[in-house]
C-alpha cells in the first residue's frame, strides 16, 4: 500500500512528462534520433513510496547512490511485482558486492581495478554478467571519485578481459552543475576518451554508453553524446 497522496502522485507524473518533453526537445536540437538517450530517475533522496510513484509514472530505470537504499527498495519493488532496472550510480564497497549483485542491472561507478576484480569474482560465483561503466575523474580533482584519465586505458583493457563484466562505456560528473560552455567542454572530453578507448579495445568491446548529465546540465550532455542522463531533483520538484 502506497502512502503518497494522490496529489503527490499527480505531481510526480507531471514532472516526469515535463522532463520527457524537455529531453526529447534537447535530443532533437542536437540532431540526434529519438530513443538514443535514456533517463535514469535518481531516487536517492526519496523513500520507497515516492520511488514507486516515479516508476508507476513511466520511469522504469531507477538510480540509487547507496547500496543499502537500493537493497530495501529492490525488495519492496519485487514484493509488489514491479520490475525496474536498477542503476547503482554511487560508490560500491567490496563488502557490499554480494548483497548488491542480484539487484543491479548497471553499475555506473566502477572506479578501481580491485573493485572490478572483486565484482568479476562474485559475478562468476552467481553465474551472471554485470554491465559496467568506468567512472572517470575528468576534473583531475583528487577529492573526486573516479579513475584518473592517465590510468583509464590500462584499466579498461583489464576490465574488458573479465568474462563476468560487460564494459559498456564511461560515466562522468561535470565539475560545475550549472551547465554552459564549461560543461560542454568537459562532456566533449569524456566522449573523446570513450572514442579513443573504443579504438584501443577494438570491435570485441562495444562502448556504446556515456552516462553524463544531471538536472542542471543534461542539455549540454545530450549535445555531446550522452546516452544516459541521471536526473533526480527535477523529477521531484514541488515535493523535496
Residue spans for each PLM region:
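Conserved alpha/beta-domain cores
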Residues: 1-216, 224, 236
Amino acid at each position: 500500500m502506497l502512502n503518497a497522496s494522490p496529489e503527490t502522485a499527480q505531481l510526480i507524473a507531471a514532472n516526469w512528462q515535463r522532463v520527457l518533453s524537455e529531453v526529447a526537445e534537447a535530443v532533437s536540437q542536437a540532431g540526434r534520433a529519438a530513443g538514443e538517450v535514456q533517463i535514469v530517475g535518481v531516487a536517492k533522496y526519496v523513500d520507497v513510496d515516492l520511488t514507486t510513484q516515479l516508476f508507476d509514472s513511466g520511469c522504469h530505470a531507477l538510480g540509487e547512490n547507496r547500496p543499502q537504499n537500493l537493497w530495501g527498495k529492490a525488495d519492496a519493488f519485487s514484493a509488489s511485482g514491479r520490475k525496474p532496472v536498477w542503476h547503482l550510480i554511487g560508490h560500491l564497497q567490496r563488502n557490499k558486492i554480494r548483497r548488491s549483485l542480484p539487484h543491479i542491472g548497471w553499475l555506473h561507478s566502477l572506479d578501481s581495478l580491485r573493485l572490478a576484480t572483486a565484482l568479476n569474482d562474485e559475478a562468476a560465483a552467481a553465474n551472471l554478467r554485470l554491465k559496467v561503466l568506468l567512472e572517470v575523474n575528468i576534473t583531475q580533482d583528487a577529492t573526486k571519485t573516479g579513475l584518473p584519465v592517465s590510468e583509464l586505458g590500462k584499466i579498461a583493457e583489464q576490465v574488458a578481459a573479465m568474462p563476468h563484466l560487460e564494459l559498456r562505456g564511461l560515466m562522468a560528473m561535470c565539475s560545475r552543475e550549472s551547465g554552459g560552455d564549461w560543461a560542454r567542454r568537459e562532456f566533449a572530453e569524456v566522449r573523446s576518451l570513450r572514442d579513443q578507448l573504443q579504438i584501443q579495445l577494438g570491435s570485441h568491446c562495444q562502448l556504446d554508453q556515456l552516462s553524463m548529465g544531471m538536472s542542471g546540465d543534461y542539455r549540454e550532455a545530450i549535445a555531446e553524446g550522452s546516452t544516459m542522463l541521471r536526473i533526480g531533483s527535477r523529477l521531484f520538484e514541488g515535493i523535496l
